Amino acid sequence: MTAGIAPMKRELKELQLLFEISQILDRTLDLREAVGPVIDAMAAHMGTVRGTLALINRQTGEISIDAAHGLSESQKERGRYRVGEGVTGKVIQTGRPMVVPRVSEDPLFLNRTGARDGLKKKDVAFICVPIKIGTEVMGALSADHVLPKEVSLEEDVRLLTIIGSMIAQAVRLRQSAQEERQKLMDENRRLQDQLKEKFRPANIIGKIGRAHV
């Protein structure tokens, strides 16, 4: 009898988490508003000590952390990768989940954010799943667990994959908005450079000299 209670409790917690996430996404598909509460809900229901959402910029190929639970702003800023680099980069490259049972034992785990420096890395497990629509991978959702834990890491992979599929549409909208913003910034920078070159003193003097010839 007792043996059957634990799985039922776990399933109930999962349903509560997925229902809470669906409510968040019903309120908004703006990832800036949705992803923070989603990752916070993961921490509350799954017991994760950290969670991150990383997005890939399809123009530059850079992967950066867009939202996180348990990371400071400076740690988020340090979380930048290329496709295929580290666990997050590998997940985005392959489109397949990865589990690192102990981050201290896997050289692929880079700890680029520095968020695990204060912990015994042998006691931290890292789970990362792709966020995709069809075959297009847009980013990755990851979570840290402090060991030992009651629920198997495989169960967490399954649950994170479900959550990733739930937020995929919001991620696509956010990714497109970020890329459009980057395109506008690049165009603005290009125009500024052109204006600086056009109005350099040497260029202006040259034009005046030619006008008097």
Go through each PLM region and give its residues.
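Signal-transducing coupling segments at domain and membrane junctions
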Residues: E73-S74, P101-A125
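AAA+ ATPase active-site-proximal loops
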Residues: V35, Q192-H212
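Regulatory loop-to-helix N-cap segments in sensory/regulatory domains
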Residues: T2-R10, D144-T161
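Amphipathic alpha-helical "output/dimerization" segments
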Residues: L17, I133, V151-Q169
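GAF sensory/regulatory domain recognition
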Residues: D40-A43, T52-G79, E105
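Acidic/proline- and glycine-rich, intrinsically disordered low-complexity segments
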Residues: E73-M98
